[in-house]
């Protein structure tokens, strides 16, 4: 007995402890169930209303206190409001805690209500209840409810995901276990076919009773729509509203209503993008989301782990892109790649000839030539085949060790004759001097593709005898040239990666003239995802499709940081146990394995290992043929579109009928999966993860041995392999699974084949022979663990980088939301004024202080130089702040006084014609047209005009500063990688530098906002001296208020699995290319179309405040 087994025998394993903790809850539910089941239909529904009332009343006093504090805000001095808002925030947290306690108390009854309802729908075709207003509203839009007199009749069948569904499910005890786990904010791991969708109904129903909203998150829109239709009637029967955000257009009233529903279904991407859109809104009417209360994430491992490297980005166009550069440099790269291919072939031929020699020196030269061929093109199929021969790979690895000794001391001898060097494990391509010479050719500038040492050049300039003007001019010239060269070198590198490391129909497909990334985990097309840092444009140039223009990031967030905003988060999946450590480290989510309702009868066989891919695929086809003859259905899992199409051709040649499900044919998914369990059916599918549809078997198929799973390759992640195996053996069905592996597979080639190859060599295995042993399967699993650890390191590192931005984003978005909603804007402005006063005194001498107070706060210094030197800085800051606040109040009152007669006149004479009014306000430099609701302005005696001015300026200043900050952070992330050469941690440097950038941004926001607000005045047209007419303010009718149209912003998931992003996550990655920030060189004209895509002119949209 091992030590771990010994400990488990004393303390029990985790699974046993989890079950022990949850079992009492299940017993309470079972005890409450008979009483609930005995209720009639109306009493059952009344019980739900009773629970809602109990939960709401648990925090009655706290809610009353919040309302009282909110009512007191208007009469509270601006300076004292911060304390009031802090009290409100504290009490709102207490309310959530009270609700959580109440939910625990009613859990057994609530779960019993759901189970009793499921039973009634299963046993009755129709359920008759007394009709409520909600039922009548429902009957007008849903087919499964009809009204007859004062009765509402619910049917037990409805349409879900395009199929007619009859409800026939009642919760098992293990599903009650799962429901408790989800309510507790944990991850429930349940095997395929155990009814995860049904389990979710329990915690969703319970948490929806608070009225704060529950989000059910799925991986694709088909599942989101299907599950909302499938489970919806169960909730609606109890008066809970259900909607799905993917049914409605972004930024629409319908989508806003979907978020106001008690239960909201949707995809992870859309929830994230709606959050970003809300933080770009220019009016409260544009907001769709409310507080992030409780989310249940389906296929939680896919969302929180596989997609974690992929931030959501909303970007807008920049006037000038670098797409032309990709087209211009493509022929040079093609010439380079062809030259390298010829070189790789030459070295391989040379290696084969020399290694066959009996001369020891020639054999050594042969292995050097082989190693050079490997460095040229590691994915060369002829090379991979030769490496699988006995003793060849081991010989090449010995050669590699020799040249890598003493920190790669002799590596230059290997790489000098090559045009570029590929490091496959590091995902990097480096040009050599020979490669640079080839692409420079007869160019006048031999350094066309060589980055100069900019620091040395700038230092040289300082030593020259130049005037300040000349020095600045020369510096500008140097920096401009460096930027141009940097972009050129970067483009060449990205094109090289596109040609040598990314294969069509493997990493991506080309459909309708567009390059679309294929998700390596699921085989699905990732719509809207683009590789970052110009790599996607490079692939577009390679495939000769339209190269999309460059864009600038307007808003971004990772799914990790989005989901961490929820008050409570839980998830369910069939495979999370292998990633339990990561889910706890990053999200503090505990994984609980729920036992199956019936024991699993699937037979999982050892891996079958072959030397070459050719032998492996031949064996796969023979195995399929044998299984089909036995009358069993077969599901063949592949890792790429290319392999699925190749196997399809091989089966067609053998005249075996089959279906193919891959990224190119995903439209037929439901139809193909529905038939996959028929006798003799053969289905080839790129990884089935997240398909969300069970393969049901007929009695004849079960008798023949059930569904057979064949994996054609081990995936990098054990979890994806487990997902594929899990398609067979659902709910105790028979089945089998086996993986066919070759030493040429990517996982084996890069991480594991050395040991297995040497074992096969020693045992004298010949081509065509197969090895099957537990030791081999364990060795492959160790390789997978190695890759998983590496990927976890990358994700954790990326999250550490994003955490820096996330803290900044939280501050900026909070400030922006205050401005948008208007409630706390006064408090923020007071803080800004204090900050400016304190800064002016803290960071300057007396003259500097005078200048800053004049420039920012438009005020004279209220103390003498002697007082400045002798008095405490806090005292001076307080004195300055008090005077600044008096000035500010006086100016805002004056603004309202000037606007009010005009507002009064327009409202009383033409109020029925206008809803909004445009008021011109200037700070002496620029004119701002402020849109304000005419009625609100009239009723507030133009105080609303001042609020609208403050809000417009703050939103405008924050948005511009945040965009610029995102750009600078992106550039910083790339530039800090060089710190590793100085034995410094790039992340630490990034954190320190980002604080400096953030402080500069906050100062900029505060300075600009206060400067404009302090100088803001309505321009008054003076009457001519000889005419006795009053002064006149010019106002205009504003366009009717519209919701912000964001339909033409580009939403994308930036793929962080590409090398450029991994660089930021791995310190030992080779030297990275510096990324130049995207330069918005051309400004948008006032009469040009607005870049947001609304179709309106810039001056009438985002340019209103500009």
Swiss-Prot record:
ATP binds at residues 175, 193-197, 694. It catalyses: ATP + H2O + cellular proteinSide 1 = ADP + phosphate + cellular proteinSide 2. GO terms for biological process: intracellular protein transmembrane transport; protein import; protein targeting; protein transport by the Sec complex. Its cofactor is Zn(2+). It comes from the Bacteria. Residues 1042-1056, 1068-1085 have a biased composition (Basic and acidic residues). Residues 1021-1106 are annotated as: Disordered. Gene3D superfamilies: Helical scaffold and wing domains of SecA, P-loop containing nucleotide triphosphate hydrolases, SecA, preprotein cross-linking domain. Its EC number is 7.4.2.8. CDD domains: DEXDc_SecA, SF2_C_secA. One of its GO terms (cellular component) is plasma membrane. It is a peripheral membrane protein. It is found in: Cell inner membrane; Cytoplasm. PROSITE patterns: SECA, SECA_MOTOR_DEAD. One of its GO terms (molecular function) is ATP binding. It is an enzyme of class 7 (translocase). Pfam families: P-loop_SecA, SEC-C, SecA_DEAD, SecA_PP_bind, SecA_SW. Residues 1057-1067 have a biased composition (Polar residues). Part of the Sec protein translocase complex. Interacts with the SecYEG preprotein conducting channel. Has a central role in coupling the hydrolysis of ATP to the transfer of proteins into and across the cell membrane, serving as an ATP-driven molecular motor driving the stepwise translocation of polypeptide chains across the membrane. Belongs to the SecA family. This is Protein translocase subunit SecA. It comes from Bacteroides thetaiotaomicron (strain ATCC 29148 / DSM 2079 / JCM 5827 / CCUG 10774 / NCTC 10582 / VPI-5482 / E50).
């Amino acid at each position: 007995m091992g030590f771990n087994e010994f400990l488990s025998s004393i303390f029990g394993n985790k699974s046993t402890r989890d079950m022990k903790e949850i079992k009492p809850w299940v017993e309470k539910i079972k005890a409450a169930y008979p009483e609930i089941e005995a209720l009639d239909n109306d009493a059952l529904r009344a019980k739900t209303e009773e629970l809602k009332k109990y939960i709401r009343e648990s925090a009655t006093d706290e809610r009353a206190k919040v309302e009282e504090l909110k009512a007191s805000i208007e009469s509270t001095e601006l300076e004292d409001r911060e304390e009031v808002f802090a009290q409100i925030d504290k009490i709102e947290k207490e309310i959530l805690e009270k609700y959580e306690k109440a939910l625990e108390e009613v859990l057994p009854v609530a779960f019993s209500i759901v189970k009793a309802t499921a039973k009634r729908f299963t046993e009755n075709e129709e359920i008759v209840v007394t009709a409520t207003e909600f039922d009548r509203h429902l009957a007008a839009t849903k087919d499964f409810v009809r009204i007859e007199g004062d009765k509402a009749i619910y049917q037990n069948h409805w349409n879900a995901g395009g199929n007619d569904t009859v409800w026939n499910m009642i919760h098992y005890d293990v599903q009650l276990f799962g429901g408790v786990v989800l309510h507790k904010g944990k991850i429930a791991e349940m095997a395929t076919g155990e009814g995860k969708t049904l389990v979710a109904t329990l915690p969703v129903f319970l948490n929806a009773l608070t009225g704060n909203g529950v989000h059910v998150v799925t991986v694709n829109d088909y599942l989101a729509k299907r599950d909302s239709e499938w489970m919806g009637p169960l909730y609606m029967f109890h008066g809970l509203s259900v909607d799905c955000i993917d049914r409605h257009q972004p930024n629409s009233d319908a989508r806003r209503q979907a978020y106001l529903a008690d239960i909201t279904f949707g995809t992870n991407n859309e929830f994230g993008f709606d959050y970003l859109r809300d933080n770009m809104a220019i009016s409260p009417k544009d907001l769709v989301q409310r507080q992030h209360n409780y989310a249940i994430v389906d296929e939680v491992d896919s969302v929180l782990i596989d997609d974690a490297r992929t931030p959501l980005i909303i970007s807008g166009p920049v006037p000038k892109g670098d797409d032309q550069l990709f087209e211009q440099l493509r022929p040079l790269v093609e010439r380079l790649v062809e030259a390298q291919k010829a070189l790789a072939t030459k070295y391989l031929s040379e290696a084969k000839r020399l290694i066959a020699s009996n001369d020891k020196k020639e054999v050594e030269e042969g292995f050097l030539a082989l190693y050079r061929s490997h460095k040229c093109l590691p994915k060369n199929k002829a090379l991979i085949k030769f490496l699988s021969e006995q003793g060849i790979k081991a010989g090449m690895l010995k050669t590699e060790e020799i040249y890598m000794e003493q920190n790669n001391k002799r590596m230059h001898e290997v790489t000098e004759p090559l045009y570029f060097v590929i490091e496959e494990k590091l995902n990097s391509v480096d040009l050599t001097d020979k490669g640079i010479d080839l692409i420079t050719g007869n160019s006048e500038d031999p350094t066309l593709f060589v980055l100069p040492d900019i620091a040395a050049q700038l230092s040289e300039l300082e030593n020259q005898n130049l005037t300040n003007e000349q020095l600045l001019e020369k510096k500008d010239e140097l920096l401009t040239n460096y930027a141009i060269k940097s972009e050129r070198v970067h483009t060449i590198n990205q094109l090289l990666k596109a040609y040598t490391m990314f294969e069509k129909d493997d990493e991506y497909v080309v459909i309708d003239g567009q390059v679309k990334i294929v998700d390596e985990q699921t085989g699905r097309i990732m719509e809207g995802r683009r590789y970052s840092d110009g790599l996607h444009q490079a692939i577009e140039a390679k495939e000769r499709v339209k190269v999309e223009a460059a864009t600038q990031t307007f808003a971004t967030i990772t799914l990790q940081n989005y989901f961490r905003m929820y008050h409570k988060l839980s998830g369910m999946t069939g495979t999370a146990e292998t990633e339990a450590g990561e889910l706890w480290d990053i999200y503090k989510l505990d994984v609980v394995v729920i036992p199956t309702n019936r024991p699993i009868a699937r037979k999982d066989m050892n891996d079958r290992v072959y030397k070459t891919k050719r032998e492996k695929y031949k064996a796969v086809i023979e195995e399929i043929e044998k299984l089909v003859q036995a009358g069993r259905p077969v599901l063949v899992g592949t890792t790429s579109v290319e392999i699925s199409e190749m196997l399809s051709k091989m089966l067609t040649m053998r005249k075996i009928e089959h279906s193919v499900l891959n990224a190119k044919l995903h439209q037929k998914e439901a139809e193909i999966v529905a038939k996959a369990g028929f006798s003799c059916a053969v289905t080839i599918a790129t990884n089935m993860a997240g398909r969300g549809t069970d393969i049901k078997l007929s009695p004849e198929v079960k008798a023949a041995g059930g569904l057979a799973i064949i994996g054609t390759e081990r995936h990098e992640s054990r979890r994806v392999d487990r997902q594929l195996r899990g398609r067979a053996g659902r709910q105790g069905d028979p089945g089998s699974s086996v993986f066919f592996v070759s030493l040429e597979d990517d996982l084996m080639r890069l991480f594991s084949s050395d040991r297995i190859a040497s074992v096969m060599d020693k045992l004298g295995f010949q081509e065509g022979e197969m090895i099957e042993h537990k030791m081999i399967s364990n060795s492959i699993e160790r390789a997978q663990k190695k890759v998983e650890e590496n990927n976890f390191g990358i994700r954790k590192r990326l999250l550490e980088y994003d955490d820096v931005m996330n803290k900044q984003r939280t501050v900026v978005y909070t400030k922006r939301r205050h401005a948008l909603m208007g409630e706390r804007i006064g408090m923020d402005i007071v803080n800004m004024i204090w900050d400016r006063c304190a800064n002016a005194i803290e960071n300057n001498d007396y003259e500097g202080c005078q200048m800053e107070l004049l420039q920012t706060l438009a005020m004279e210094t209220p103390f003498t130089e002697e007082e400045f030197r002798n008095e405490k800085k806090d005292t001076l800051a307080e004195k300055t702040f008090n005077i600044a606040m008096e000035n500010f109040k006086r100016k805002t009152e004056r603004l309202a006084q000037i606007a009010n007669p005009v507002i009064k006149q327009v409202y009383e004479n033409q109020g029925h014609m206008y809803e909004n009014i445009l008021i011109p306000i200037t700070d002496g430099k620029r004119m701002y047209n402020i849109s304000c609701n005419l009625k609100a302005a009239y009723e507030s005696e133009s105080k609303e005009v001042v609020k609208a001015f403050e809000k417009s300026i703050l939103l405008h200043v924050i948005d511009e500063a945040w965009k610029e900050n995102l750009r600078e952070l992106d550039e910083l992330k790339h530039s800090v990688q060089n710190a590793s050469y100085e034995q410094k941690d790039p992340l630490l440097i990034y954190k320190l530098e980002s604080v400096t950038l953030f402080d500069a941004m906050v100062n900029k926001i505060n300075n600009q906002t206060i400067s404009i607000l302090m100088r803001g005045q309505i321009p008054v047209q003076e009457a001519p001296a000889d005419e006795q007419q009053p002064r006149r303010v010019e106002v205009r009718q504003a366009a009717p208020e519209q919701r912000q149209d964001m339909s033409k912003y580009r939403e994308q998931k930036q793929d962080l699995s590409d090398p450029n992003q991994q660089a930021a996550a791995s310190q030992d990655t080779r030297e990275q290319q510096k990324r130049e920030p995207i330069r918005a060189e051309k400004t948008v004209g006032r009469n040009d179309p607005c870049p947001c895509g609304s179709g309106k002119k810039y001056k009438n949209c985002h340019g209103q405040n500009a």
